Amino acid sequence: MSNQIEIDNKIIKYLSTYSYKPNKVVDALITETKKLGEVAKMQISPEQGQFIELLVKITKAKNCLEIGRFTGLSTLFIAKGLQKNGKIFSVDNSNEFLNFAKRYWKMAKVDNKIVSIFEDGNIALKNFID
C-alpha cells in the first residue's frame, strides 16, 4: 500500500493556475531542460520548487545541503529562499549539467549563494557531519 496521495488532473490544474508565480529564469531553465529528452523527468516541478523555497524562507535557513542537482532548478529555488548571507552546498557526483545550471543561477542572481561540490553524496554527507 502506498503512502502517497494520488493527485488527479483537477488538483494539478488548480495548483498550476493558483500556486506557481511565473518567473522568466525558472521558465527558461525548465524549457531548456525539457529539450534534454527522457532525462528531464528528474527535474522538480515549479510548484514543488516554490514550496521548497517557502520552506527555506519560513525556517530562516542560513545554510542548506542538497544531494543531487541535475540542471539546478531546486538549487535555484533553495538559494532564492535563503537569508541574505546564506549558502546552499549543492552536491552531485556528475558535473555533466553544472555549466548549464550555473548559467541560470547567474541569471537569477543567486550564484553567490551556491557552492557546487563534485562528490558522491554519501561521502559529502559524511564530510559535513564530521
Task: Go through the PLM ranges and name each one.
Residues M1-K24, E38:
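N-terminal auxiliary segments of SAM/dcSAM-dependent transferases
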Residues S19-K21, G37-Q50, K57:
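Conserved SAM-binding loop and adjacent beta-strand
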Residues L29:
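Beta-strand-loop-alpha "switch" segments that mediate conformational coupling across diverse proteins
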Residues P46-D130:
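S-adenosylmethionine/decaboxylated-SAM
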